[in-house]
Each structure stands twice: as structure tokens, then as C-alpha cells.
Amino acid sequence: MNKEKVFLEYFNKEKLNSEECFKNYKDRKVIFKKEIDRKIYFIKKYVPYGKREKAIAFGLQRDRAKHYEYISKKLDKIGIQHVHSVYSKIKRYSFFKRASILVTEYGGEELAKYSKNYMEHIELFKKFFDIYIKLAKNGIYCTDYNLGGILINNKGELTLIDLDAYKTKIILTKQYKRKLITLLRKMYTHSNETQEFEEFCKSEIERVIKELNWKI
């Protein structure tokens, strides 16, 4: 089977109504799940709108598929395990209008599935925060770092996904640090986790702040 031909079909709007549509974020980011030759693929389709659309057109921002690959190279350099893309394509309809797709293979189960019995996997959850610290020390920050955005691969290793939510910054203001920590706390404040797990997360986030020496 010609995989590229299959992947390109996901530029078609008709696919939004297909059973393969896994998640849809107001048609701006759509995730499809497709099995090809006994392998599971996730096809992400990005359609920029508004300010992002104009910024990409004028070269002020990277297309999100290209940004994923940009962050992927950064993670390779610092030795952080993540799901690599196997295919990407940008389709331009006009100077402003465009869409892109990025394809990854199935990378494992979400770490979130293990939060109810986290004590049995305590080292993985500590590693989750260790990775956050390592990213920040290398100028890489995530505004949506959560247990659903990291997988456990078939080797039992933590593996990052959703790299389009990661950013690089040279200078970090105190205000932005506060924002990052507030967003990190959402992983337990916006979920139905146990009190014990919530206390564990609070303790680990305090460790994050201390190790990064963030005066917030």
C-alpha cells in the first residue's frame, strides 16, 4: 500500500466525518487514527487561522508540523525520548490559506492510565517531572505538559508526544515562569485524581521550582 497516498487523503474535509477522526479541536487541529499494514498511525492535520495564519504566511512563525520536527531535533540533541514523525506535508491554497499534516506511529500507552495506582510506578512519575526539569534547563518549555502528553513505550520508557505544544525561549521572565507552573498544576487541579496523587504532584512541582531556581 502506498502510505503517502493514504496520508494525503487527510487533507480532504470529508475525512472530518470519518470514523478515523480521533480528536477534533474546532477543525484547527484534528487527529486521525489509521491502521495500515498492521501498524497504527496518528495523522495530525493543522489548519491555522487568524493571527497564526498571517504570522506563518509572513515567516514569523513555523507551521505546526514543521515546528514539531524542529522541537524533535532539539530533543534528539539532549537525549530525550519522543515520538518521531514519519511523514509531514504542507499544502498551500493561497498566500495565507494552508494546511499541514504530520504522521507518527503508535508510541505506547498514556502515563495518565497509571495515575490511580501511581505508587506502583512511582519512578516513572518522578521521571515525568525530571524530564520537565531537563527540558527547562535546555530552554524548552511546554504550555500543556500533562500525563496524557507522555507515553510509556514497549521498553517501559517515557516518550513525549504533542511536540507542537513545546516552545523555545532564550529569556524567561518571572511572569512566564509563573504561567508555566500554573499550567503544570492543572495536571491535578483539572482532573479527578486521588488526594494522595495530588499531594505527590504538589511536592514534585515544588522540587521542579527548586531545581530550576525559579524565584516566583
Model-derived features with residue positions:
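Conserved kinase catalytic-core helix
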Residues: 65, 71-81, 112-149
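Conserved ATP-binding subdomain of kinase catalytic cores across diverse folds
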Residues: 13-107, 137
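Basic, amphipathic N-terminal segments that precede the first structured/catalytic domain
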Residues: 1-27, 69, 73-77, 82, ...
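Surface-exposed, interaction-prone regions with an acidic/low-complexity signature
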Residues: 1-6, 10, 38-51, 60-64, ...
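Short small-residue beta-strand/loop micro-motif enriched in glycine and branched aliphatics
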Residues: 51-55, 110-115, 169
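C-lobe/activation-segment region of protein kinase-like
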Residues: 153-216
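Residue-level preference for long, well-ordered alpha-helices that form the structural scaffold
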Residues: 61-64, 120-124, 173-177, 197
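Active-site acidic catalytic loop and adjacent metal/ATP-binding pocket
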Residues: 31-34, 130-168
